[in-house]
Amino acid sequence: MLDQRRHQRIRFSVPQKISIGYGGEIGEGVIENLSLSGLMMRTPMPLEISRNVGCEFSVFDSPLIDVPAAVVSRVCDLFGVRFQQGPISQILIDDAISAALASGKASILSVHEMGGRKTMRITGGLCGILRSDFMHALTRMGVDEIDLEGVTAVEQAGLALCLVAANRHRVTIGAQSPCFAEAWAQALTAPGPLEKLVTGT
């Protein structure tokens, strides 16, 4: 589990706050996405690449995670940091990610290719926060099938994305978790209004 998620980006249904220690000051930010190896965050603090920062955050109801990190990228107020963690903080981060995915409060979207076919796999919450990544995979990368076996919670905005994929892009809806299968069956009875959440038409 640890190795599989080391570089997978986890997005949250509700933005998670983070406290940042830098240059003797404490500032605030918001986590954009999280992996075992680091995170992306937005903050007004003037962080500099290659400098060290202290990161303190919790993921929903997780214990407080306090980990040092190095700033590795910046685009405007969006910073990427790589954790300099020990085994305890790594376990805390993995446990927090696992709990958030199981509850549907966090999501992973990944694309895998096998035998010339591309499969989009969604784990955790099928929600509107995935729209940008979902549509990029659908329209830029080309997807043949969507694997939803790992979905633990479903939002209407997420169902709308799947309807657009199936009806307008002829993508196959593959493996399904019980909660997705139930919501999908209901969505298929009246797909029009849901699709409008994505297309506006």
Segments (PLM) and residue ranges:
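Amphipathic alpha-helical interaction surfaces in cytosolic regulatory modules
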Residues: 120-196
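C-terminal output/interaction extensions
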Residues: 78-112, 185-186, 194-201
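Short beta-strand-centered aromatic/proline hotspots
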Residues: 29, 65-72
